[in-house]
């Protein structure tokens, strides 16, 4: 496309932005400023979804100063158009450069198209109106952003997303126990922030090994197209912008990249709205010497308004490390470690009071005294009387308990910045059943161990332990690469027999290294022809996806998936319930990570954990330490990290060559310390935090509403009709799924997101969750949103003529149906749509100008209408022009009255909600320092901005349908 500075263009997909101006043309990119909203958009010059705006003689245009010009002719110079005509205020000849046009000008007036004979098919008018209604319905939903993602409707996840996602610039720590879905919670929050306009630019920092996993997760689950940035990508992007991070809105990168000063400086200068940091517990910090990684995240968290930290539970982190994460979120609030510890001790009284309220029993005197002291600024006596009363409605008592709990949550603890769910507070997890299978140590391994000992060599204790735990690796060091250890290792024989006896079961096998995983696949294939696939760090993301899909396939798929330690990070396989641990990792957290591939919320079966091991070896001793010392196979062990840190040296000595007495002594000490830590964690459980994190009945209510929305057959019908009209080919594939393909008769030349080879979709959430290759279609899905935008952003369905066959009315009776849109140009981030989203207003006029829309509903009226061809329709319009012109003026009067009422309601709702929230937060700030001043300032500014935008609300005629009565 030929672009020049100052040219005026309109966005095909975001027409609400108004008239745009080209402000930069550089390399392959063009930047357009939309003055109505103050927003910039950067597009690829070759594929920009933009339409050039050039008016014709006879049109009237408005200047940015407010005067109009009746165009008589136009000229072009240096790619810019100059309009010449008559000035509306002076009546003299004048010229107007296109750069000085009013940016709020609306385009393609339906009445102009109607009188020009550009008449659309009847069904297109209907689908346009349905599209406007769907957009309004979505914009007004308080669950916006929660329905679209391809995730299970799990209460605590939806609750956290609902609470955090609707905040301005949320700064929170997501610290759920392993398996409870922190990544999904973060994705839901990101999705909601983007969809509502609270955020536009997002940076996700993850460990290097998880970059592509996050990329796939964001795309498959949330339909968010992130870009992975590494050094090569930064160098390549330099051609388009001095700062590579400005070339994309959604970016994933590793901490390694940002350790480089140049890249960190660029990231700091990139105006992110939201920063997400995964595995934040690896950021080491002490007051005297914070790590480089911690300093990188700290620098970013100081300039990025919203921050999400995904981390291990506070129990696993230890107090100082937990404080370090909170300090990143709010350094003013968490400024001193000793002060933090003192405050934490005061939470115990709050926890006792919360536990009393969360139960059903009468409150003790101690609990009442504690509540009275904690909520001293509020009169809680009426609520206490309700709770203590004998003969009173249980719902009233429960409401009183809930109200006091909410007061505690608002005023005390870290509930606004920390969310931590535990398995103790979230139900729905399966049992873990441990099965161990002893085998004799092969002579070949014993020989390799003796040779290794004779050769000596300096090795750390940890390296020696690693060798002892994986004898097959040591054996291969002394044999050539083709040495087939799997031909004599009894664990391999056991594995083959196990798979043969469980033919119908999917089995996940995890080994420590990629070489071991590849050798096992070779053994299964060559010895028994067992269908297995591998999954390791040497494979590309596409290869791993294919392996995962092959394993997930029910018919004709692999029976077993063999993963390496690193290769399995971040991947979950809940559809399998058998886990074979071919060896054991040295770290309890890695063991939990392995089991966590299956032991996740949503797993429907008990998990069978199988461990073949070699007797009288380091493998057996480590098994005993995990099983007898930590009970780590059958239960999660939040204290595993602490216990390993404390007993690592003793454990390594036992593994490398300790005797039975040393092992017994280690087990006794470990068991004793395990019980101490478990008791301390139980005592220190923050009941208030748990209640706030899982959401209770409120979370269940959100999930019930989302489930009802999934079953909305009316919505499904509207979406299918939309695709029919656009020309999308739909092939029923069975199993609740449809294949969508562009047909030869597409209404639009391109349909972003719909590929030539098609896409498989479903309206059923369970089907989508069981198949990675099937997209879940909801109102929020890009394929639906794009379809709505294509229709409403074009002139499709803006004019129509129909016949009403009704002998009760005189032949020739005329009705004029007008669809207006009430809206205002405002940045998405202003949240104006919460109060005045683009709203369709229907007016149905008879020939006398009476509005019948309240008496004649759209659906029943539409069913009685018949289409006419364009030629006849054009003649009917021409013949009816004398009647139509005054009706348009009358229709606008009715619509304007409706808009005035909508604006008044929007203003009242906005003032009520924001004033109420501001008053609440201001009063809470006096007793809870977790309320940030930025949040209060944001609310004050938002009220002023929204009031200005509401004053500038506009009425636009969107579609016209002329209806004539016929008896033929």
UniProtKB/Swiss-Prot annotation:
Its EC number is 3.6.4.-. Residues 491-655 form the Helicase C-terminal domain. GO terms for biological process: regulation of DNA-templated transcription. Keywords: Activator, ATP-binding, DNA-binding, Helicase, Hydrolase, Nucleotide-binding, Transcription, Transcription regulation. InterPro entries: Helicase_ATP-bd, Helicase_C-like, Helicase_RapA, P-loop_NTPase, RapA_C, SNF2-like_sf, SNF2/RAD54-like_C, SNF2_N. It is an enzyme of class 3 (hydrolase). One of its GO terms (molecular function) is helicase activity. The keyword Transport does not apply. Residues 163-332 form the Helicase ATP-binding domain. ATP binds at residues 176-183. It comes from the Bacteria. SUPFAM superfamilies: P-loop containing nucleoside triphosphate hydrolases. Interacts with the RNAP. Has a higher affinity for the core RNAP than for the holoenzyme. Its ATPase activity is stimulated by binding to RNAP. Belongs to the SNF2/RAD54 helicase family. RapA subfamily. Transcription regulator that activates transcription by stimulating RNA polymerase (RNAP) recycling in case of stress conditions such as supercoiled DNA or high salt concentrations. Probably acts by releasing the RNAP, when it is trapped or immobilized on tightly supercoiled DNA. Does not activate transcription on linear DNA. Probably not involved in DNA repair. This is RNA polymerase-associated protein RapA. The gene is rapA.
């Amino acid at each position: 496309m030929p672009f020049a500075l100052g040219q005026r263009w309109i966005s095909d997909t975001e027409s609400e932005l108004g008239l745009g101006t080209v402000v930069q043309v550089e390399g392959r990119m063009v930047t357009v400023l939309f003055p109505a909203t103050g927003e910039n958009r950067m597009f690829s010059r070759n594929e920009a979804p933009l339409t050039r705006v050039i008016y014709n003689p006879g049109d009237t245009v408005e200047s940015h100063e407010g005067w109009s010009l009746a165009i008589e002719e136009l000229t072009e110079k240096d790619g810019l158009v100059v309009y010449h005509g008559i000035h509306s205020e002076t009546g003299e000849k004048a010229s107007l450069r296109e750069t000085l046009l009013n940016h709020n000008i609306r385009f393609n007036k339906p009445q102009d198209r109607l009188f020009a004979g550009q008449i659309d098919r009847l069904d297109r008018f209907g689908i346009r109106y349905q599209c406007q209604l769907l957009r309004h319905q979505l914009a007004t939903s308080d669950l916006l952003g929660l329905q679209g993602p391809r995730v299970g409707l799990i209460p605590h996840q939806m609750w956290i997303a609902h609470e955090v996602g609707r905040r301005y610039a949320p700064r929170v720590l997501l610290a759920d126990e392993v398996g409870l879905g922190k990544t999904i919670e973060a994705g839901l929050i990101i999705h909601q922030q983007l969809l509502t306009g609270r955020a536009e630019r997002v940076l996700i920092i993850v460990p290097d090994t998880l970059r592509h996993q996050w990329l796939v997760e964001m795309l498959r689950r949330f339909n968010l197209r992130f870009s992975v940035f590494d050094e090569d990508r930064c160098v390549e992007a330099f051609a388009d912008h001095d700062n590579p991070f400005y070339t994309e809105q959604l970016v994933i990168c590793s901490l390694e990249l940002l350790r480089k000063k140049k890249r960190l400086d660029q990231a700091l200068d990139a105006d992110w709205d939201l920063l997400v940091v995964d595995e934040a517990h690896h950021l080491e910090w002490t007051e005297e010497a914070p790590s480089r990684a911690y300093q990188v995240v700290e620098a970013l968290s100081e300039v990025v308004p919203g921050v999400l930290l995904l981390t291990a539970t506070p129990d696993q982190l230890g107090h100082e490390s937990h404080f370090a994460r909170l300090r990143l979120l709010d350094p003013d609030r968490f400024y001193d470690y000793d002060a933090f510890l003192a405050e934490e001790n005061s939470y115990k009284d709050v926890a006792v009071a919360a536990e009393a309220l969360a139960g059903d029993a009468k409150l003790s005197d101690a609990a009442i005294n504690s509540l009275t002291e904690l909520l001293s600024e509020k009169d809680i006596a009426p609520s206490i009387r309700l709770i203590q009363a004998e003969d009173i409605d249980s719902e009233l008592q429960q409401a009183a308990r809930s109200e006091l709990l909410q007061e505690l949550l608002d005023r005390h603890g870290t509930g606004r910045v920390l969310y931590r769910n535990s398995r103790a507070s979230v139900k729905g997890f399966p049992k873990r059943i441990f099965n161990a299978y002893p085998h004799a140590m092969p002579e070949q391994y014993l020989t390799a161990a003796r040779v290794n000992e004779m050769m000596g060599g300096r090795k750390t204790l940890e390296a020696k332990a690693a060798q002892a735990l994986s004898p097959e690796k040591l054996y291969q060091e002394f044999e050539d690469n083709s040495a087939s250890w799997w031909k004599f290792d009894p664990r391999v024989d056991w594995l083959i027999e196990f798979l043969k006896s469980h033919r119908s079961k999917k089995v996940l096998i995890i080994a420590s290294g990629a070489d071991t995983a590849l050798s096992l696949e070779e053994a299964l294939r060559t010895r028994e022809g067992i269908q297995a696939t591998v999954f390791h760090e040497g494979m590309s993301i596409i290869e791993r996806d294919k392996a995962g899909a092959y394993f997930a396939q029910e018919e004709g798929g692999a029976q077993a998936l063999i993963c390496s330690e690193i290769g399995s990070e971040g991947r979950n396989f809940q559809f399998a319930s058998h886990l074979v641990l071919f060896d054991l990792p040295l770290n309890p957290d890695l063991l939990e990570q392995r089991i966590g591939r299956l032991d996740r919320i949503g797993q429907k079966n008990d998990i069978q954990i199988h461990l073949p091991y070699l007797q009288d070896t380091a493998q057996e001793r480590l098994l005993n330490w995990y099983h007898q010392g930590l009970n780590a196979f059958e239960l999660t062990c939040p204290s595993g990290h602490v216990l390993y840190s404390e007993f690592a040296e003793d454990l390594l000595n036992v593994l490398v060559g300790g005797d039975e007495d040393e092992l017994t002594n280690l087990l006794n000490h470990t068991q004793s310390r395990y019980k101490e830590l478990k008791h301390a964690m139980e005592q220190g459980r923050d009941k208030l935090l748990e209640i706030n994190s899982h959401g209770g009945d409120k979370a269940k209510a959100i999930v019930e509403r989302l489930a009802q929305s999934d079953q909305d057959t009316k919505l499904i019908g509207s979406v299918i009709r939309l695709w029919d009209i656009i020309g999308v080919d739909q092939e029923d594939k069975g199993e609740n799924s449809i294949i969508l393909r562009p047909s030869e008769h597409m209404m639009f030349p391109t349909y972003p997101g719909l590929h030539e080879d098609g896409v498989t979709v479903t309206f059923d959430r369970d089907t989508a969750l069981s198949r990675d290759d099937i997209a879940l279609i909801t109102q929020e899905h890009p394929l639906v949103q794009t379809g709505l935008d294509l229709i409403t952003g074009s002139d499709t369905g803006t004019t129509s003529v129909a016949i009403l066959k009704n002998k009760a009315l005189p032949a020739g009776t005329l009705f004029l149906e007008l669809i207006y849109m009430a809206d205002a140009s405002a940045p998405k981030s202003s949240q104006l749509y919460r109060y005045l989203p683009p709203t369709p207003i229907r007016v149905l006029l008879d020939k006398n100008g009476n509005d019948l829309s309240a008496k004649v509903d759209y659906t029943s009226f539409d069913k009685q209408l018949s289409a006419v061809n364009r030629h006849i329709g054009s003649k009917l319009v021409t013949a009816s022009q004398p009647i139509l012109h005054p009706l348009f003026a009358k229709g606008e009067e009715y619509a304007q009255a409706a808009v005035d009422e909508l604006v008044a309601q929007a203003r009242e709702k906005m003032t009520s909600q924001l004033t109420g929230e501001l008053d609440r937060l201001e009063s809470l700030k006096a007793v809870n320092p977790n309320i940030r001043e930025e949040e209060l300032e944001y609310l004050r500014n938002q009220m002023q901005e929204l009031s200005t935008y509401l004053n500038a609300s506009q009425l636009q005629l969107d579609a016209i349908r002329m209806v004539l009565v016929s008896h033929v």
